[in-house]
Amino acid sequence: MITVDQIKRVLPHRYPMLLVDRVTELVPGERASGLKAVTCNEPWYEAVPDDAPAEAYHYPWTVLLESWCHVAGVLVAWEEPNPDVLEGMAMLLGGVTDAEYHRPVLPGDVVEHHVRLARQVGETYMFEGESLVGDATVLSVGRLVMTMRPAAELKDPAGEVT
């Protein structure tokens, strides 16, 4: 099991955007699984009024997908971690196809992300997988493309990261 302190050594994300609490399975070059515990104390719920209906607490689907991507990021970078996006290799999302949100995720749910590396071409990775709450699929990802690029190549001529 990979705990949050170890995840922080691999991913550059920090609060409020570190969206994976634990990696429960990691087979480098093949697959990874991880957990995200959803709570009502997350920043996306700050503006929800006290008298709001349950639908107001649906976890944002874009954040759910980002959480799934964090598990993919751990899978890619585990053997060569670089949490500093200004140096070394930077992790970039290339695109997502066939992603489906199947049902709402609510505070109190524990989301289990499953990521499989479908193909690798050089420093470009193609993933597929799903996320579950209990036995229910809440997200399926047909294809997600991620790539690693030297951070130096991402700087503009003035030396700023773009």
Which positions does each model-derived feature cover?
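HotDog/MaoC-like acyl-thioester-processing domains
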Residues: P12, V105-T162
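Catalytic strand-loop segment that frames the active site of acyl-thioester-processing enzymes
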Residues: Y15-Y59
